[in-house]
């Protein structure tokens, strides 16, 4: 029986997760009303006042870096949950649950994974390759994915 290479197993899980990432409509996530406006626009005469009014509203709906950061992390969490894999932070460490056990992830490998996933989601290439954007994704993950230690039971010894 061979030993399990946990680093390879973790990388395989992260690679599988990245492959499942599909483009995300960040505008519709950031502005839920955009979808309704797009439907209304499709039903308007192209040069009508109503169409122009809707187009102006849609043009004002700009997706910014905060939207990309927040929704990228939410989408990664959704995909991990869909596969029964956990991704979380506990005591400033990142952990990956593969369905059987938790193991600690390398920070640099995880940041690289976040950037790859963001690129596949449709984050502009300049952002998805920029190290500062990777840091922001990582920081958002660290804030959003905190796993609190279970409360001590009064019946269990400390």
Where would I find each of the regions flagged by the language model?
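Intein modules and their embedded homing endonuclease domains
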Residues: 2-158
């Amino acid at each position: 029986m061979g030993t399990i290479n946990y680093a390879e197993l973790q990388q395989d899980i992260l690679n599988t997760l990245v492959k499942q990432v599909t483009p995300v409509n960040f505008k519709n996530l950031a502005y839920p009303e955009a979808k309704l406006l797009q439907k209304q626009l499709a039903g308007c005469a192209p040069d009508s006042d109503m169409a122009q009014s809707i187009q102006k509203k849609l043009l004002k709906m700009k997706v910014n870096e905060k939207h990309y950061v927040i929704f990228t992390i939410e989408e990664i969490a959704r995909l991990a949950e869909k596969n029964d894999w956990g991704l979380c932070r506990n005591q400033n460490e990142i952990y990956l649950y593969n369905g059987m056990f938790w193991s600690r992830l390398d920070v640099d490998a995880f940041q690289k994974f976040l950037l790859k996933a963001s690129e596949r989601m449709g984050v502009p290439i300049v952002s998805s390759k920029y190290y500062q954007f990777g840091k922001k994704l990582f920081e958002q993950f660290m804030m959003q994915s905190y796993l609190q230690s279970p409360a001590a039971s009064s019946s269990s010894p400390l």
